[in-house]
Amino acid sequence: MSKILCVLYDDPVTGYPKSYPRDAIPNIKTYPGGQTLPSPKAIDFKPGQLLGSVSGELGLRKFLESRGHTLVVTSSKDGPNSRLDKELPDTDIVISQPFWPAYLTEERLAKAPKLKLAITAGIGSDHVDLQAAIKHGVTVAEVSYSNSISVSEHVVMMILSLVRNYIPSYQWVVKGGWNIADCVERSYDLEGMNVGTVAAGRIGLAVLRRLKPFDVKLHYIDRHRLSLDIEKELNLTFHPNVESMVKVCDVVTINCPLHPETEHMFDDALIAKMKRGAYIVNTARGKICDRDAITRALESGQLAGYAGDVWFPQPAPQDHPWRTMPYHGMTPHVSGTSLSAQARYAAGTREILECWFEDRPIREEYLIVDGGHLAGAGAHSYSKGNATSGWEEATKYKNGTS
């Protein structure tokens, strides 16, 4: 029997919900492009419940314990005295999330001789040192596409919020004001702007499709060029490199994976090549942007706004400069963990576990590392290497509600 260690974010400060605003969520049959949704043999939760927090347990406890496995669920993941570090040495399977990542570094993997499977409940497995996973024979899998549409919707929301200056306008209402000039002095129409995406995979392409009705000019870069049919359908302009694209764009949205080649891609030099007053929306990974370069660009006016829900490390310490920099629209990492998305990535996590325990192949699109090599989605989107350095700063986080 196996020991499964599941690292999830904390419950709401008001306690685990006893009821929800909606009685049901839409039943999505397929993903765009024909990929099927997660297909476990059964689930032990009602879609629309809070599954991604500690008490939600991804709906896995009944399934695992009825088969004799041990499930340990915790939010304690950072520092040498964390529950993660205490439980890891005799753990067979680790489940984590991008939103509250259990950083599986070389040091941690070396202390976990029994660990054979690391599952990301969601998409994006950069919290795992993939080179170390290959070295130690750990299979890495994630629930591809489970929250791609969720994230793409969040991107469009953030673009509109920045360009239309929504957050300051909302704050005037909360403060009891009616300061229209203050609201509109930084407000523009999105119509007619040039909008580009760094990567046009599942999320990036979904963003492009959702932006087309806004009558914008769409641009993209990707190491796998889209088909001519899609380029014609969306009237896309393909660029051979990121420098070419950012020079012409008013809005840039980042939708690529984090790996050594994309780490700190948006630094002082690249931002200086952008239009003055451009906007960046980053729901990919915080480390793709140089933290201090973003802050400097907002303070100087080179950027008109920056929004996103990804930070490095996560959770972000209270003194992280992105919390207080001007003209930002940051949120905690929530774009891919709506209640709708949770139902899908919880089901996908169970599907992966069922395959693992029954010695059936995990579907190819879920695999990142397998058999000592990058595999499946990992071979398509990642590169070997480590993007976890600096994770220790997450130990500085103190819950602002305590």
Model regions and ranges:
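An N-terminal-biased, well-structured beta-alpha scaffold segment characteristic
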Residues: 2-139, 267, 392, 396-402
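Conserved beta-strand positions in the Rossmann-like core of class I SAM-dependent methyltransferases
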Residues: 72, 219, 287
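Alpha-helix C-terminal capping/helix-to-coil transition sites in glycosyltransferase folds
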Residues: 89-90, 111-114, 247-248, 273-276, ...
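Short glycine-/small-residue-rich Rossmann-like dinucleotide-binding loops
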Residues: 98-99, 123, 250, 256-258, ...
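Residue-level detector of alpha-helix initiation sites
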Residues: 124-127, 142, 146, 202
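Phosphate-binding beta-alpha-beta segment of Rossmann-like dinucleotide-binding domains, i.e.
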Residues: 136-138, 143-194, 206-209, 213, ...
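Rossmann-like dinucleotide/phosphate-binding beta-alpha-beta segment
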Residues: 166, 181-276, 384-402
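Rossmann-like dinucleotide-binding domain for NAD(H)/NADP(H)
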Residues: 277-402
